[in-house]
């Protein structure tokens, strides 16, 4: 095939897509495991603390505070800079963020189970 502008364009597009897919597939099983861990923690919290009914408000307040603090740290300008992307503390913060997403999703699903 000759090197026309159209073939070069499609070659560059396919190379860009391939590099994006390879970047997203790094640590994919760990990310899924952390999401499921957060979902499991949400189920345990809803089951254990939901038995008495007295602890629901306190646990919900603590979870909301933890989620907001983590979101503040995750999206602050200190961690957004490019040179700290591969820092160990930033990678652990990303892992905790995946657990947080699983926790929120698990509580959301439990709320639907209780509502039906």
Curated annotation (Swiss-Prot):
Reply yes or no: does the keyword Chloroplast apply.
yes
- Could you tell me which InterPro entries the record lists for this protein? Uncharacterised_Ycf20
Q: Keywords in UniProt for this one?
A: Chloroplast, Plastid
Localization terms from the record = Plastid, Chloroplast
Location (main, coarse): plastid
GO cellular component terms given for this protein: chloroplast
Keyword S-adenosyl-L-methionine (UniProt): no
User: What is the top-level taxon of the source organism?
Assistant: Eukaryota
Database matches in Pfam families: DUF565
Cross-referenced PANTHER family: PTHR33787, YCF20-LIKE PROTEIN
Into which family does the record put it? Belongs to the ycf20 family.
> Protein name, please?
Uncharacterized protein ycf20
Q: Which organism is it from?
A: Mesostigma viride (Green alga)
Q: Its encoding gene is what?
A: ycf20
């Amino acid at each position: 095939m000759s090197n026309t502008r159209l073939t070069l364009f499609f070659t560059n597009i396919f190379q860009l897509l391939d590099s994006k897919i390879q970047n997203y597939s790094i640590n994919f099983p760990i990310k899924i495991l952390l999401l499921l861990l957060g979902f499991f923690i949400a189920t345990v919290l809803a089951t254990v603390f939901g038995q008495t009914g007295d602890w629901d408000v306190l646990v919900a307040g603590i979870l909301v505070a933890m989620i907001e603090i983590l979101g503040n740290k995750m999206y602050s300008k200190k961690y957004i800079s490019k040179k700290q992307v591969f820092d160990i503390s930033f990678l652990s913060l990303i892992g905790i963020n995946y657990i947080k997403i699983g926790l929120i999703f698990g509580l959301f699903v439990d709320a639907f189970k209780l509502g039906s």
